[in-house]
């Protein structure tokens, strides 16, 4: 009798293991969909996110309603080849564009060093660029101007800014470079990693979605910058 009971218990345990294995999610059929659902999302600005932004990217005089902004989560490949989690705040009008673009960049393993809210750098653009941070919304004026930047509307994004600086050339031949540490990457005839040009995938995807590239401007060259009107 004891032997029969033991066999019954062993049989039950084996069947339970089989049932648990059969109930595990398929790594091939569901993992990609789950990743897309969790990480490539656009949501209204939550209280927690807004607290991070207040007094930084979302300044006291900000004229852009919070309701027009969206919090985006993406995945991307870092310079070390590892998958990273990124976050952006943008205008709702370009949220779907950014989700689609970053999905394609992720599939292609396009390297982006980091994607953090600029609030992590106290909304200081120079510091954010120095750390090669890809960012979007920041209520501020164009450097050296009284005009509001497209970043103020959440309709512009800077990609790998250290390697793709903003370059302003003067008539006397001198130039201003933002970030300052990006001066080594102002000669765009050279070949180097992470350079955005017309052959670059990021350029091609943003253009496909109707964005303008700062590298095509005449008055200055903002190689990191994409905006959509």
Where do the PLM segments sit?
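Sec/Tat signal peptide C-region and signal peptidase I cleavage site
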Residues: 14-15
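Bacterial N-terminal signal peptides
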Residues: 2-11
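Catalytic cores and adjacent binding grooves of peptidoglycan-active enzymes
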Residues: 142-144, 148, 154-229
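Active-site acidic/histidine clusters and adjacent loop/turn architecture
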Residues: 64-129
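A generic secondary-structure signal marking the coil-to-beta-strand transition
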Residues: 70-72, 133, 155
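N-terminal module-boundary/linker segments of secreted carbohydrate-active enzymes
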Residues: 18-82
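Structured segments of extracytoplasmic/periplasmic soluble domains
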Residues: 77, 97-111, 140, 162-165, ...
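Active-site-adjacent substructure of cysteine-protease-like catalytic cores
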Residues: 125-152
């Amino acid at each position: 009798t004891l032997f029969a009971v033991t066999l019954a218990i062993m049989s039950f345990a084996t069947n339970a293991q089989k049932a648990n294995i059969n109930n595990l999610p398929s790594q091939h059929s569901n993992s990609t969909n789950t990743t897309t659902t969790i990480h490539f999302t656009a949501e209204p600005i939550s209280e927690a996110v807004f607290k991070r932004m207040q007094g930084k990217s979302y300044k006291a005089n900000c004229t852009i309603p919070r309701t027009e902004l969206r919090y985006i989560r993406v995945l991307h490949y870092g310079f070390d080849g590892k998958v990273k989690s990124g976050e952006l705040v943008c205008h709702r009008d370009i949220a779907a564009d950014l989700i689609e673009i970053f999905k394609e960049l992720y599939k292609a393993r396009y390297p982006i060093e980091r994607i953090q809210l600029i609030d992590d750098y106290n909304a200081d653009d120079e510091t954010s660029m120095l750390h090669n941070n890809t960012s979007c919304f920041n209520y501020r004026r164009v450097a050296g101007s009284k005009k509001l930047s497209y970043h103020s509307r959440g309709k512009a994004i800077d990609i790998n800014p250290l390697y793709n600086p903003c370059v302003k050339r003067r008539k006397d031949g001198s130039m201003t470079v933002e970030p300052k540490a990006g001066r080594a990457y102002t000669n765009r005839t050279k070949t180097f990693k992470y350079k955005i040009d017309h052959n670059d995938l990021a350029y091609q995807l943003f253009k496909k979605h109707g964005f303008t590239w700062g590298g095509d401007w005449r008055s200055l060259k903002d190689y990191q910058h994409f905006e959509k009107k």
